Amino acid sequence: MKMNLPPFIELYRALIATPSISATDSALDQSNHTLINLLAGWFGDLGFHVEVQPVPGTLNKFNMLARIGEGKGGLLLAGHTDTVPFDDGRWTRDPFTLTEHDNKLYGLGTADMKGFFAFILDALRDIDPTKLTKPLYVLATADEETTMAGAKYFSESTQIRPDCAIIGEPTSLQPVRAHKGHMSNAIRIQGQSGHSSDPSRGVNAIELMHEAISHLLVLRNTLQERYHNPIFHIPYPTMNLGHIHGGDAANRICGCCELHMDIRPLPGITLNDLDGLLSEALEPVSQRWPGRLTISELHPPIPGYECPPDHRLVSVVEKLLGTKTEIVNYCTEAPFIQTLCPTLVLGPGSIEQAHQPDEYIDTKFIKPTRELISQVIHHFCHH
């Protein structure tokens, strides 16, 4: 059966050659169905039980869960199938053709992160499934780069409860055990426009926004005082007021003003908590000016994530790699997978290459990544 599997570089080539862009712009957004079917075929050839799941609320997007071995617990290896769009003018190579040059493999998704599936498949050639005493799961998700709809749906709907999970995002093989979340909102104030010669005939949205901002700055201080986690370089939740637009002329009362802001919560603060704090902070403005203030999401929010430092997954991986776990500033699917089991983010390639023109992975990662995957499968599925 394993003889059917193409060589490592051909697996990689086929993954990169199968476009799977996710984008908020529907003109650029693509289904990942072809890629999911490709993966499903390969894992099926290796004797895995494969399930392909449509992701509700998406346009033709799918998750794949492959399982081999029986029983409870085990290990989940996870990754996303989608890539960001590419800027044609800034790429010097074809994004969908795997190109090797100067010990680098170039292509869209080489580092972030379709290539991870080639590493998993390659490592599985040498593993005898009859020797597994616990199940090995491989999860391929949709839309990580936009809404994280695939990971969210999977974590809410699956029955599996592995002992632990590894998400193969490009961390240069440095294990990551925590990151903050991200929530971005638009605060919109609807005033009443009119000529500036008679202020009493209008409601100035800029003045109301000034009031709203003063309440937001109080909330910013509250977040800083109330929440603290020393593992982070900035040990409290941050708030940034990033963009504001209102009015159209000096001699007109401003009829509408909109502020875009973000909050980066620590692990342990739920998205519901944050929504509540934001609404509560702006409630005095809403009460004074009924119906004039609205809060909306700019992007789907992501909670913070932390894997307990004393979990066996952390000690095993730190020992295998001879390095300590790290904390990072970017967001991943880990908060959703962490609801099922302790999760680390750990994979080949550098985050510096993600979302860049001429994206690549250094070939120096090939051997250690293959070894690491074999070792963690052996450790968590053979005992």
Swiss-Prot record:
Its EC number is 3.5.1.16. It comes from the Bacteria. It is an enzyme of class 3 (hydrolase). Pathway: Amino-acid biosynthesis; L-arginine biosynthesis; L-ornithine from N(2)-acetyl-L-ornithine (linear): step 1/1. The active site is at residues 82, 144. The keyword Zinc applies. Zn(2+) 2 binds at residues 112, 145, 355. Coiled coil: none annotated. It is found in: Cytoplasm. Zn(2+) 1 binds at residues 80, 112, 169. It catalyses: N(2)-acetyl-L-ornithine + H2O = L-ornithine + acetate. Its cofactor is Zn(2+); Co(2+); glutathione. Binds 2 Zn(2+) or Co(2+) ions per subunit. GO terms for cellular component: cytoplasm. The keyword Zinc applies. GO terms for biological process: L-arginine biosynthetic process. Pfam families: M20_dimer (PF07687), Peptidase_M20 (PF01546). Catalyzes the hydrolysis of the amide bond of N(2)-acetylated L-amino acids. Cleaves the acetyl group from N-acetyl-L-ornithine to form L-ornithine, an intermediate in L-arginine biosynthesis pathway, and a branchpoint in the synthesis of polyamines. Homodimer. NCBIfam families: AcOrn-deacetyl (TIGR01892), PRK05111.1 (NF003474). Belongs to the peptidase M20A family. ArgE subfamily. PANTHER family: ACETYLORNITHINE DEACETYLASE (PTHR43808:SF1). HAMAP family: ArgE. This is Acetylornithine deacetylase. It comes from Pectobacterium carotovorum subsp. carotovorum (strain PC1). The gene is argE.
